[in-house]
């Protein structure tokens, strides 16, 4: 049996002796420090293998016995092979340059001399001296000379010669120098250490709070950020400013020129938003006409929106103090009942409403909640934009209108438009025509100021700006209009159960109707360049009973 095994056994090459390894088959193989330990490990491995193997493996075990002495020689070779760092050895470029400079008699070399030393004394660069294959390693040498502080450059005395490279006598650092950054509160090493200690102390002293205890708008407590730890840091204000202004929707503020005329505290109040979700309230606005600030008692739109019930609800929850504040908002002039007329068509462009009210609030800028116009015909902004003395009563749903017995003739307190129209003579006043069959006031509104929506479409009556005209009793509205307009306007104003247009409904006004017509004509009609009363769009077709040619379409523009 043993003779058969010897006959099939192959002679083992001493250079490729079999290596024993543990049964776990780990890689790389463990390298024993001592030959004795390796012999013991080999013996243990062979003995362990012989216990598990059959008689054939036991017979081959003596043949593998001479391997341990060879394994002792292989161990150190592998260890040296794995420690190689670069293709030419374990030295770096900086080490090679240092050796080249130290080998020179003057301890200095030019760049070309360093190249020559590399090709001559380093075996790896012997065949890489030509220009095609030397671009890479020569570039690396130049970089190392520039980056390391151990090398210094000395200007050559001769003209047209390259500089000398020498070793730094002070002994510079090896390796690349880190990039320098400007020291600040955020990246300085000293401040970073202080910041870390301060944050730990602050976290230890902070009481634990649950998210349920915090108010609704407060942030949830969590780990302190860098901006929260250092409030004085310049970078810490960016997130705070963003959170403070993230919900601010617009930039509708008073002009800086107007705010500069106020006191310092008033200017700050005028420039600050009333809330993050709305524009500044009318209380902080400036009156363009009188140059005075609006009273602070005016209600804000957010407070008016709820009790007024914009979606068709009632006004049962409207506080009495709100009505009293609106009546007293304009001081003794409003209580005396002497509202003056100011007629700027810009008011109709800013949401309808109008132009008949105190001049302090006529040209207010466009207020928020303007999008209600898209859903409701008679918008809340139209009624609340100028904030006249009769604005809040005008917002209330009117009582059911009683049938009127006759046309609008001889009623006390009629519009004094006749005096205003007398300054601009037109066609002669036509005699009053008999009333046509009653038409709906909503179908043919005659409005001095164009409203975007029909009056009363949402249950809110538009403001009675026409009622601000005071005049002598007994004046006729139809006499105030030019001839064709007076004849055509007689139809919709006839008697019937329908309501009058909001511009002509005198029941909506509860104040006095006194006014100086001459001051109106001199101050407002003459000075205004944008006055344009256009009745073409509001005229109904002439009644069939009227004789004569139809009136021509024309616009009445004062000169």
Swiss-Prot record:
UniProt cross-references to Gene3D superfamilies, sorted A to Z: 6.10.250.1690, Winged helix-like DNA-binding domain superfamily/Winged helix DNA-binding domain (1.10.10.10)
Maturation and modification: Phosphorylation of Ser-184 is be important in regulating the transacriptional activity.
Single GO biological process annotation from the record: regulation of transcription by RNA polymerase II
Composition-biased stretches (Pro residues): 213-222, 539-553
Location in or out of the cell: Cytoplasm; Nucleus
InterPro entries: FH_FOXO6, Fork_head_dom, FOXO-TAD, FOXO_KIX-bd, TF_fork_head_CS_2, WH-like_DNA-bd_sf, WH_DNA-bd_sf
Keyword entries, A-Z: Activator, Cytoplasm, DNA-binding, Nucleus, Phosphoprotein, Transcription, Transcription regulation
DNA-binding region(s), residue ranges: 88-182
In-chain residues carrying the UniProt-annotated modification Phosphoserine: 184
Superkingdom of origin organism: Eukaryota
Tissue and organ expression note: Expressed in brain in areas of the nucleus accumbens, cingulate cortex, parts of the amygdala and in the hippocampus.
Annotated stretches, region: Disordered: 1-77, 163-183, 197-232, 534-559
One Pfam family this sequence matches: FOXO-TAD
One GO location term (cellular component): cytoplasm
GO molecular function: DNA-binding transcription factor activity, RNA polymerase II-specific; sequence-specific DNA binding
Function, in words: Transcriptional activator.
PANTHER family, sorted: FORKHEAD BOX PROTEIN O (PTHR45767), FORKHEAD BOX PROTEIN O6 (PTHR45767:SF5)
Listed name of the protein: Forkhead box protein O6
Species for this entry: Mus musculus (Mouse)
